[in-house]
Amino acid sequence: MNNRVHQGHLARKRFGQNFLNDQFVIDSIVSAINPQKGQAMVEIGPGLAALTEPVGERLDQLTVIELDRDLAARLQTHPFLGPKLTIYQQDAMTFNFGELAEKMGQPLRVFGNLPYNISTPLMFHLFSYTDAIADMHFMLQKEVVNRLVAGPNSKAYGRLSVMAQYYCNVIPVLEVPPSAFTPPPKVDSAVVRLVPHATMPHPVKDVRVLSRITTEAFNQRRKTIRNSLGNLFSAEVLTGMGIDPAMRAENISVAQYCQMANYLAENAPLQES
């Protein structure tokens, strides 16, 4: 039997499809999401409706974003979900979540079992809409969740950690084994909750500057920041901010990266493109 076939659908490798089928895990995720009637619930990648059905049962209306046209068509004719669903058959990577929140008149509650091949770039896409999002619950590769929640002085800490924690409070929810999926992925999975900060703990003047600094620092993470960020900051400037130029990218806190971004935004602002 082809273990890529589930409920008559052949999982497509190019879409990174792995279908959740463990009822205990499904119940645990739905409990963590705790959907309520009247909320603007949005699912990314509903697939074969493992989460869509139990979430949809609790709601009068549910919005889903599904790239796979066959799966979108199945959802349209779903016996009890069909009338409740608003289906966008398009790529979540290009979806305008801000427009949807405006249309629905409230911040979105976004959830999904995300395709692992696009999970990191999709996170960055969603971060640009945190003003329009109340919270997010995602199943991700465990390694990605570890990176999202990592603190300084750890191998997992990187650009994704800094940017995620700049925008959101990041909370791990549960770990999920490969056996919970068809076909089983080659990696462990985990569920994470991301709640955009109501008030930014470390506001920056220009988030593009923060993005640039973290990209340059972590692209050369084995170098000291005296070297990796030498084109942006002198050792004297870093020392003046209380940041040791001999530290590496992984030793610098989110607050310190934001401090550096604000210094650069004031003293060498990016030109509008």
Swiss-Prot record:
Its EC number is 2.1.1.182. S-adenosyl-L-methionine binds at residues 18, 20, 45, 66, 91, 113. The keyword rRNA processing applies. It is found in: Cytoplasm. Its main location: cytoplasm. Keywords: Cytoplasm, Methyltransferase, RNA-binding, rRNA processing, S-adenosyl-L-methionine, Transferase. InterPro entries: KsgA/Erm, rRNA_Ade_diMease-like_C, rRNA_Ade_Mease_Trfase_CS, rRNA_Ade_methylase_Trfase_N, rRNA_adenine_dimethylase, SAM-dependent_MTases_sf. GO terms for cellular component: cytosol. The keyword Transcription regulation does not apply. GO terms for molecular function: 16S rRNA (adenine(1518)-N(6)/adenine(1519)-N(6))-dimethyltransferase activity; RNA binding. It catalyses: adenosine(1518)/adenosine(1519) in 16S rRNA + 4 S-adenosyl-L-methionine = N(6)-dimethyladenosine(1518)/N(6)-dimethyladenosine(1519) in 16S rRNA + 4 S-adenosyl-L-homocysteine + 4 H(+). Belongs to the class I-like SAM-binding methyltransferase superfamily. rRNA adenine N(6)-methyltransferase family. RsmA subfamily. Specifically dimethylates two adjacent adenosines (A1518 and A1519) in the loop of a conserved hairpin near the 3'-end of 16S rRNA in the 30S particle. May play a critical role in biogenesis of 30S subunits. This is Ribosomal RNA small subunit methyltransferase A.
